[in-house]
Amino acid sequence: MIKLLCKTTAILSIALLYGCASAPSPEKMQAEVANYTLPKPAVADKGLVYVVRPSNVGMAVRFNVFLDDKEPVSEMGYNRGNQYIYFYVTPGQHVISSKAENWSDLPVTVKAGQVVYLKQEVNAGFVIARNTLVVLDDLEGRYLIKDGALGTIEKESK
């Protein structure tokens, strides 16, 4: 019983420390992405959206990404831990939705030729992981994509 308690305490301590890790400095991120090219480039007549899930917490749970509504035909793809997806959008106002235990909706305005970076933050859920979508700046977006793996892309545009 004591061994089990010690193991559980050790695992929870590691998880707590992992969750408190901070992002590297902007200087370090800039140095690491200086010569980095995005896997999919922007195009002149459309916007490009990258959705990244940099955390490995709850990686067995997939976070599905939808464009403009929550219908199955609007699913653009999904991420598991440390993955990203991308898709093109027509310029204008869109709502990106991410589904885990909950729905997280984020309205974004995308211009032609612009790249928008969104992060799926992992939160503790009642049964499975919950999520929150947040907008990233260009530097942090490129940094997180550089270190991620490609998720599952259902479609590259809608």
Regions found by a protein language model. Name each.
Residues 20-158:
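Short loop/turn and low-complexity linker motifs enriched in small/turn-promoting residues
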Residues 1-22:
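Sec-dependent bacterial lipoprotein signal peptides
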